[in-house]
Regions:
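Catalytic Walker B motif of ABC-type/P-loop ATPase nucleotide-binding domains
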Residues: 68-71
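ABC ATPase nucleotide-binding domains
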Residues: 136, 140-182
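H-loop/switch region of ABC-family ATPase nucleotide-binding domains
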Residues: 103-104
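Conserved ABC ATPase "signature" region
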Residues: 6, 21-39, 64
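Conserved ABC ATPase signature
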Residues: 17, 43-47, 51
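A short, surface-exposed alpha-helical micro-motif characterized by mixed small hydrophobic
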Residues: 109-111
């Protein structure tokens, strides 16, 4: 099966129907938007993980649903494609689509998402804007780790990182030396 077939509107067709020219055009437009049109005739087995993620997004777009649920859509992508997926999701939301994403890239979520639902301890800890949810106390609680939140001086975006205490770092380094060097 080639990529063009994967990105089409088959879920909406009866078993005896074929895609119309409009369906084919829509699939190609969605592939164009996600930067995968040049892959249309390639077998699915010949594309990278990042290309597969973008092809899956094209497939979702071709379904023309009002709600998109994207479960870790940036997994396995390099930083350029990760940002691209978040940008796509933001553009779709601005066009009136409801976009729900499960993500672990907090810095990108802070930059592109208008609303954040933070889960931790098996429950919903917060539901608000990135500035109100991505605070050190809430994130430290959610991740059971010491989290630092600051502003990037170059673009003023929220920047979220973990803090490593020196005692733990020294202990881990000593253990690693023991594992690797003895």
């Amino acid at each position: 099966m080639c990529i063009r077939d994967r990105a089409g509107r088959y879920p909406y067709l009866k078993w005896w129907e074929r895609e119309s020219e409009d369906d084919k055009r829509l699939a190609l437009d969605c592939m164009e938007y996600t930067g995968t049109r040049e892959l249309a005739d390639k077998p699915v087995t010949e594309v990278s993980g990042g290309q597969k993620q973008r092809i899956l997004l094209a497939k979702v777009l071709a379904q023309q649903t009002p709600v998109l649920f994207l479960d870790e859509p940036t997994t396995g992508l390099d930083m350029v494609y990760q940002e691209e997926i978040f940008r796509f999701a933001r553009e779709l939301a601005l066009m009136g689509k409801t976009v729900l994403m499960v993500v672990h890239e907090l810095n990108l979520a802070a930059k592109y998402c208008g609303r954040i639902l933070l889960l931790g301890e098996g429950k919903l800890l917060a539901d608000d804007t990135p500035e109100r949810v991505f605070t050190e106390p809430l994130l430290s609680r959610a991740y059971a780790a010491d989290i630092a939140v600051s502003r990037n001086p170059l673009n003023n975006n929220l920047e979220i990182t973990t803090r490593v205490d020196e005692a733990s770092k020294e202990k881990e380094t000593a253990l690693l030396k023991k594992i690797c060097c003895e």
